[in-house]
Structure formats: C-alpha cells, structure tokens
Amino acid sequence: MSTQPNILWICTDQQRYDTIFALGNKYAQTPNLDQLVNDGTTFTNAFCQSPVCAPSRASFLTGRYPRTTRCRQNGQSIPESEVLISKILSNAGYKCGLAGKLHLASCSDGKVEKRTDDGYDPFHWSHHPQPDWEENEYTKWLKEKGQDWYDLQGEKINEYVHFGPPSEYSQTAWCAEKTIDFINAEKGKPWFFSFNCFDPHHPFDPPAEYLDRFNAEDMPLPSEHPAEKDTKPSFQLLDRIWAHNNPGEFHTEAMSDNDRRQVCAAYQAMVTLIDDQVGRILQALEESGQAENTIVIFMSDHGEMLGDHGIYFKGPHFYDCQLR
C-alpha cells in the first residue's frame, strides 16, 4: 500500500447544502452521506465562488477566484495557463482519473469540451446524460448494454417532473461504475479520482423507483417572500416568470403548490440516487482494503434555487441555497 493517501473527490452538480439528513433535512434519505458527515469533517460555511458551473469549477480546481482564472461565466474557457489540482497531483506521482463532467470550457450545441493539460488519464467524459455528443462515454456505455437514452425516459408526472432512466442505467450509476473500476485497478498506487455526476441538476427526472420513496404532499413549499419583488432588479423578476428567463422551458409563474412540492420530491429523490451510488463506492473502498488510506471529499459545484425567492435552477442570485 502506498504511504501517500488516495484522494476520492466526489462532486455532484447543483446540489444544495440542505439536502442531507445529517445536516438537518428531515425529508432526506441519505444514509451514506450521513455516514460521511458523522465520521468526517463538515464545512457548513463553505461558499462556492460563483453560483454557476464553469466559473465555480475553475475556481475550486485551481484555488483561484473567477476574476483571476478569467472563467467568469458558462461558455467561457479556462486559459491553458491555469494549473489544475489534478495536474499538480499527476506531477507528484498520482494516477489521476475522471468520470462524468469537467466543464472548464464551452461544450454546447454538440461541441466537445476542449481540455487543457489537466493530468487526467483515464478521462471518461460525459458532460450530461443527453446523447448530444458522439464522445459522450455514458452514451457509449448505454449502447454497449443495448439501451438508448431516449427510450429510457419514463412518464411525465406534470409539466416539471418526469421519470428518468431506471437507476441501473443512470449516468450517476455509470459514474460510480467507472469510479469502482478505477479504485480496483489502481490499488497499491497513490491515486486521485474525480466522480462528477450530473445529478441532481435539472431536468427533474429521477428513476421511478426513487421518486416512489417520497410523498410529494410531505414536502415543504419553497421559501418565498412576495414583498421582496419590490426591491429586486429586472432580470431577477424575469427569472420568477420563466426559469433562466427562457420562455417555453420551465414556467415558474404558472406552478401550483402541488407542482412545487412534486419538484422538491423529485430533487430529493435524485439526491437519494446519488447517496446509493456513493454507498457503492465506499463499499468498494472497504472491500479493496483502501478505505483507511483514502481521503474522501464530497461537495457540489453550487446549489439550486428550488423555488426559493420564486426562482428555479440557478443564475446570478447570491443566496445561500445557491452558494453553500
């Protein structure tokens, strides 16, 4: 066994800090994350440096502010001169791997993300579950199993929630499988692995068997204060009508209380899916005899408004639910 500790870096996408039972959410079903909270150190006042993906990821992978990395919004690319922690560890003799999302450069409209010298090898890239790129390794994995992502989509619950693929075909399960394969293959060497699933990022599409664990009627309504509209800028008021001010995508203003509760249940169900996959990985560490020599970091790139202040998804809104 290496005397240098292994590092398992689990980063989810758009997960609020208050989605874990051990941190006070009585509706959460997160036994494996609870174990990490109880056995480790929890940073309850940690704030990401931007409430959207790319600048936040560029910041925590370099230890520098978005204004310094010059990656200040989605669609911008991190300069090649910026050095990632994965490259530093690779230079120090660590075997570094990744499964899932990186998002340090633009990758929309079928354009594959351009990499810098990031030190990752293997690099199992899947920006999100949708098969928008031939290079999406999750899509390739589904095809190897005789599955098509579109065919795996389930029924619509309402205008805001639908069933996604069964858990065994989810991108989160694929990320866990790649992580476990790496852990077992690299035993005895110092390694660093980045697990970067897309969940619980919208769309709100948990597997049916996970949403069935939650009763939407039990979910709390978002925290909203109608009077605050009088003091907010126009772009924030527009986000209260359509999420991301994108007419036709997610009509926030038209939601009923039942719709809001259903979204909350779906979001929490996606977190439970993550929790189960984290449990698989922790079990693999134990079974391979590497648990005692592995530092496990669990975090998210930023949070989710989830209806608080009348807003869904994310954006230029500096509230705790997006930053902690």
Residue ranges of model-derived segments:
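Formylglycine-dependent sulfatase
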Residues: 1-324
